[in-house]
Amino acid sequence: SRLKHDAGFPADAIHYCLREAGIDLSELSAVVFYDKPLLKFERLLETYLAHAPRGFRSFLMAMPVWLKEKLYLKTVLRRELRALAGLDPKAPLPKLLFSQHHQAHAASAFYASPYQEAAVICLDGVGEWATSSIWHGQGNQLRPLAELHFPHSLGLLYSAFTYYCGFKVNSGEYKLMGLAPYGEPKYVDVIYRELITVREDGSFALNMRYFAYPVGSRMINQRFAALFGAPPLTADAEPSQLYLDIAASIQQVTEEIVLKIARYAQQLTGASKLCLAGGVALNCVANGRLLREGPFQELWIQPAAGDAGGALLAQAFDKCFVTVVNNGGMPIEHQAPCNIPAHAA
């Protein structure tokens, strides 16, 4: 569509893939979507209930799109696929599967990599509940080892500073990374003291007294701005040295957390190679430091590490995943015989 972050149905992309493969829709064994909408809706409801009555306006704004479309995504996808293929409304379609968000990230990273064994780290804003996860890939098996849940999120922390420095959330994070070299990391201690507690294994907890994103329309609150002594920068304003230093500070904190998570992942897996996925994996400065200072001999980053790359899991998902779920709803094992090699693209 040539529209950045286009949220519409990817008809052109589907047409292209089918054309390149020389097949039509009826020849597909499955269509896989990279999210579980009902789990995500569960997270939204639990979060709004936990913060009520705060966030009521945000709740009212969010619900229409869920009640009209997102909760019925399977029906929407079937309708769009039939229209795309020019099929009768009752014509059969390939089976429709839904993976968990971080499951999609991990599969897209490991199964597209050149490795037969690797640690896999997924870092982003949030999927259904998970915000950070560690996996171990071996041959055709991909096993989750650890994960961190919303609202504690490295991606959302970085997005909060993206917003504070005048850039658009979920779009301008690369600009914040580019701004960082022009500043000095003077506020690293402030961030660690007030905003985030980080453990040696890389797990962390955000001080939610400073953030509004769980139920608000903004990422941060007035307490966050007061911490740095200035309001959020407007989009058209020239950043002063304060904002340059803040950008440098959150970039350094992000790099240090990524390094700790990587060291823990290496301890858990014993692997010498690492695959990365999730939006945070697009932070090339952190990736460079991870390659130089991290515990892994080789690093492979999913080229479309953000949500756009979730579709890469599809070719491996149907044959390679058997999900066992414990009482807490977390996937604890994903392993099954599979004839798709781990390096398949």
Segments the model singles out, each with a brief description of its role:
Residues 1-318, 323, 329, 342-345:
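Short acidic/glycine-rich loops and adjacent helix/strand connectors
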Residues 329-333, 337-339:
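Short linear/disordered segments characteristic of secreted peptide precursors
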